[in-house]
């Protein structure tokens, strides 16, 4: 609901159908508990003759066309000197087969993938959203590959989430489970850093940077000695290090042809660009601060809360 700001028409009501009573209670909505399949069958029969206005159908078609153009722009943005992560997604979307599976879980990537990924089949898209479960991508690739040995399984992992669960790679190598890990190294937490900046906190503590000499704050010097590609090699993976999208595509074809678990390592731009988003999230801002950025963010927060609909 975009923190109660998305649905502004007071004449619209929602019927939520859930498979468990616990999840059925939504603010101001009718609550229905039903078997998912039976509910869909009943709704299909009930709404069989329903049609929206032709003007609305045309509006939807125009919006879809406009978004398709935006997807192409994000996939081929040509960011420099480092590629944007959306360019990596575009390359994968082009290279992966209809029955192959892409996996992701945490950070800014699930949002980007939801906005941009063009799934060719229902099985191709495997993304965990619920609690941004950092590290899920590493063991999830094992499970999906065991369930679908005929598919190429590609797990996209950020350098932040990788550090949560790399030890699972030992099992991947031990069992020679042929998966492809795509490691995007941007030396920081992209999603939470952007949120911090939008809340006036200037990305504090969200980048992998050396502490400044004589200071308690990090400067712009990337931490020396942390080598994730070398770490992956130490677990026994084949690692292909690339720097451009053209090199990435070539590396993917090599990984695809291999019979061993492989990581493709590429540095991407911490600052995007990312696909546009218009939803608002109610994340409170400090009401008292000496930082001008926080003071401005607090004023914006008070302004942006006004359109909220309080259903109860």
What kind of feature is each model-predicted range?
Residues 8, 24-25, 31-33, 37-41, ...:
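Thiamine diphosphate
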Residues 40-51, 64, 68-71, 75, ...:
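Structural signal for hydrophobic packing residues in well-ordered secondary-structure cores
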Residues 55-59, 105-106, 266-267:
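Short coil/turn segments at secondary-structure boundaries
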Residues 64-140, 144-145:
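Active-site diphosphate/adenylate-binding microenvironment
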């Amino acid at each position: 609901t975009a923190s109660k700001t998305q649905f502004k028409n007071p004449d619209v009501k929602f019927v939520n159908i859930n498979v468990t009573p616990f999840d059925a209670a939504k603010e101001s909505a009718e609550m229905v508990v039903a078997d998912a399949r039976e509910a869909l069958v009943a709704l299909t029969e009930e709404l069989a003759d329903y049609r929206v206005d032709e003007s609305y159908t045309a509006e939807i078609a125009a919006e879809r066309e406009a978004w398709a153009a935006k997807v192409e722009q994000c996939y081929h943005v040509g960011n420099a000197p480092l590629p944007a992560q959306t360019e990596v997604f575009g390359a994968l979307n082009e290279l992966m087969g209809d029955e192959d599976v892409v996996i992701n879980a945490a950070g800014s990537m699930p949002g980007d993938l939801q906005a941009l990924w063009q799934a060719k089949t229902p099985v191709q898209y495997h993304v965990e959203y619920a609690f941004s479960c950092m590290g899920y991508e590493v063991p999830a690739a094992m499970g999906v590959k065991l369930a679908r040995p005929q598919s190429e399984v590609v797990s996209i992992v950020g350098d932040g989430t990788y550090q949560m669960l790399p030890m699972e790679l030992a099992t991947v190598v031990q069992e020679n489970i042929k998966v492809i890990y795509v490691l995007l190294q941007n030396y920081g937490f992209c999603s939470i850093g952007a949120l911090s900046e939008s809340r006036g906190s200037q990305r504090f503590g969200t980048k992998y940077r050396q502490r400044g000499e004589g200071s308690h704050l990090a400067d712009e010097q990337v931490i020396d000695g942390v080598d994730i590609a070398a770490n992956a090699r130490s677990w026994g993976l084949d690692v292909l290090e690339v720097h451009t999208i053209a090199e990435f595509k070539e590396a993917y074809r090599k990984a695809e042809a291999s019979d061993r678990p492989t990581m493709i390592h590429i540095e991407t731009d911490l600052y995007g660009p990312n696909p546009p988003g218009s939803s608002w999230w109610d994340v409170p801002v400090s009401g008292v601060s000496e930082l001008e950025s926080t003071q401005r963010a607090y004023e914006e927060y008070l302004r942006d809360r006004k359109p909220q609909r309080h259903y109860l």
